Amino acid sequence: MKIDKEQIIKAHQLHKNDVGSVQVQISILTDQIKKLTDHLLANKKDFISKRGLYTKVSKRKRLLKYLKERNIETYRDLIKNLNLRG
C-alpha cells in the first residue's frame, strides 16, 4: 500500500501550514526508509540506493536525537505512532 506524502504530513503536522517540523521530517524519512528497504530486498546489488538508505537512516537518527533532547513526550508519542524502537 502506497502512502502519499501529503497524508503523512497531515497525520503528523502541528498546525495547518506545518510541512517542515521535526515530527513531519521524521515521518517522511521513515516512509522513504521503508520504501528503500523493500527496493533493496528485491535489488540486492543496488549499492547507490543502499548508500541513500544509510544517509536517510542517519538523518532520521539525528532528528530523533534532537527531538528527544527538546521534547521527550513528543518523542515518545512519535516513536509509538511510527512503530520505531526507542
Curated annotation (Swiss-Prot):
It comes from the Bacteria. GO terms for cellular component: cytosolic small ribosomal subunit. Keywords: Ribonucleoprotein, Ribosomal protein, RNA-binding, rRNA-binding. Gene3D superfamilies: 6.10.250.3130, S15/NS1, RNA-binding. GO terms for molecular function: rRNA binding; structural constituent of ribosome. InterPro entries: Ribosomal_uS15 (IPR000589), Ribosomal_uS15_bac-type (IPR005290), uS15_NS1_RNA-bd_sf (IPR009068). One of the primary rRNA binding proteins, it binds directly to 16S rRNA where it helps nucleate assembly of the platform of the 30S subunit by binding and bridging several RNA helices of the 16S rRNA. PANTHER family: RIBOSOMAL PROTEIN S15, BACTERIAL AND ORGANELLAR, SMALL RIBOSOMAL SUBUNIT PROTEIN US15M. Part of the 30S ribosomal subunit. Forms a bridge to the 50S subunit in the 70S ribosome, contacting the 23S rRNA. NCBIfam families: S15_bact. HAMAP family: Ribosomal_uS15_B. This is Small ribosomal subunit protein uS15. The lineage of its organism: Bacteria, Bacillati, Mycoplasmatota, Mycoplasmoidales, Mycoplasmoidaceae.
